[in-house]
Amino acid sequence: MVILTAFTNYSKDNIGRFVSSLEQTGFTGRKIVIYYYPKPSMVEYLENNGWEVHTYGNCPLFINFQRRKDMSKLILEYKLEEEYICCTDIRDVYFAKTPSDIKEDLFLGYDDNSPIANNEWNTQAVKTGYPSLYKKLKNKIAFNAGVIIGKGKILAEFFDDHYELGLNSGYTNISEPCPGLDQSTVNVLAYSKYKHLLSFKENKYVLHMANLDNTEESQLEGYYIYHQYERNKKHKEYVVNLNKKSYI
């Protein structure tokens, strides 16, 4: 298993919990980070914590989109095609258990377990990027783009397709922040070319928490990865104290 992430303009305070939580799981695989506009102190911090830091002097497009193309390049450059890779956001991801046990050709977790049409943010993202496909997608359960896991050769192709599709989307200025582009493009691909690779069985790999304020604490137990926990006022403290829980 390889962990692959990307960031820019974050401090140690922003990513420290991500770095330390993975370390606390006992993860022994490779850890690779793409770092745009690098600062020497942050490079040193990451390298001291066992990360391979791949730096870029600029980020021509919005990072959530640009990272997909650069992740694909890196997978091929580092010959990671046969590895299982966990591609994640960095600031709001917490590892409770080592992800090395997750061996899926392609895994995406549901955003909030509701159809795209029932979520205003996902609806707007798809309507902006792919208005002609909204009718086809509106009753599909939205996938979250913050954590994507799979075999390297599949992810490299997925990310290349993601980049080409996004360049031709309805988002007109993708050098500026356009947070809906990444996730809407992931959903278009997930429900078309890559649908046959996805496992729709219930699992406890990743929990996306932004819209789970009404969830009971007992329903949070046992996941490998928690995403967007900082947005969840009710359960944030539960997540940040996970390494003290007896069931992990």
Regions found by a protein language model. Name each.
Residues 28, 80-82, 104-105, 195, ...:
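Short, high-confidence coil segments that cap the C-terminus of an alpha-helix
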Residues 11-16, 117-118, 235-236:
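Short N-terminal binding/cap micro-motifs at the start of the first secondary-structure element
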